[in-house]
Amino acid sequence: MSHSRYFFTSESVSEGHPDKVSDQISDAVLDEFIKQDPNSRVACETFVTTGQVIVGGEVTTKGIVDIQTIARKTITEIGYTKGEYMFDANSCGVLSALHSQSPDINRGVDRKEEIEDEFDRVGAGDQGMMFGYACTDTPELMPAAIQYAQELVRLLAEIRKEGKIMTYLRPDSKSQVTLEYDENDKVLRVDAVVVSTQHDPEPAGMSEAEFQEVIKNDIIENVIRKVIPAELIDENTKFHINPTGRFEIGGPHGDTGLTGRKIIVDTYGGAAPHGGGAFSGKDPSKVDRSAAYAARHVAKNIVAAGLADKCTVQVSYAIGVARPVSIYINTHGTGKHGLSDSQIQEKAEAIFDLRPLAIIRRFNLDRPHGWCYRDTAAYGHFGREQFPWEKTEKVAELKAAFGL
């Protein structure tokens, strides 16, 4: 590579962040619709603020879903169960404004029985471009900064829910990780870690400064050092823990939350392009979601097969049309075995069917088993082995295509 050493940063937020509360409610609603009717068409958006939840969007389904119950159950499981949070699962208002999907969209997406190939009958739910990415930074083939950032807030939530240590934790938190890379795009060290977590008021007899010092030490020892490999931390690594001090007011009372506002947290932490479409609350006929999952699957299998150290995949669609308008693969000059990007792309297009119904069937997106959409709505949609688009079952086929 021609560039010199450089720094790269990614952030994440916990399940208690207001935007993630919204994402999880939207996906919990989607899960229930799909459970009752796998052919449900759902576009569910959620707004949360002080003492209030609004769920809106468009649905075509045979299912009947109790929005109140799902919203309150989700909020309870996240941990907003106390009146002092000013957003409480038992007392907040829940307004449902879901209505029927436009028949104009339905007509383009739903099956056209006169077409012979079943996978050609189901068109994309919208136009747009989606990206997938993989690299050799981590065993999960994810960029390291976002992977560590996700794990930090996930562990923080686990500690909070366990309730054995750090019992002052409240649900809202954020993380940020800055890595230093060498000239060959290999991670050298962690330069900085930022963690901000909501917490209870300081205990009686303890000053704010003393309490923040306790929080800082707890997070460094019980969270950061458990997540970040020790060899990446050195004497120059900086830890910024609750850098503004007190963080008692948080969650939907501190900031309004909306579905779909954490699309970089949901994906690759800025290490790869993003087509702009959010995931949560959307059924799998919407290629914003399903094709992004498929593009990750393609990229991950290419890297796992040893064809490249990095891979970006772009796929684009026209509404109502099943076959992608375009497919683009870029290995960023890291291709192996003398393979060009065009050679890799030609074989990948033959191996991976990127028509919407083919994607849905490959990953059972209309009948999730062993996972649910709400699982995806916090801590990232990628780099987590429970999801079917993370499988590398196409590695042998890719290698065989090149005689490897």
Swiss-Prot record:
HAMAP family: S_AdoMet_synth1 (MF_00086)
Pathway(s) where this gene product acts: Amino-acid biosynthesis; S-adenosyl-L-methionine biosynthesis; S-adenosyl-L-methionine from L-methionine: step 1/1
Coiled-coil region list: none
Pfam families: S-AdoMet_synt_C, S-AdoMet_synt_M, S-AdoMet_synt_N
Lineage: Bacteria, Pseudomonadati, Chlorobiota, Chlorobiia, Chlorobiales
Cofactor dependence: Mg(2+); K(+)
UniProt KW keywords: ATP-binding, Cytoplasm, Magnesium, Metal-binding, Nucleotide-binding, One-carbon metabolism, Potassium, Transferase
Protein name per Swiss-Prot or TrEMBL: S-adenosylmethionine synthase
Gene: metK
Binding site for K(+): 45
Regions of compositional bias (Polar residues) in chain numbering: 1-13
BP GO terms, sorted: one-carbon metabolic process; S-adenosylmethionine biosynthetic process
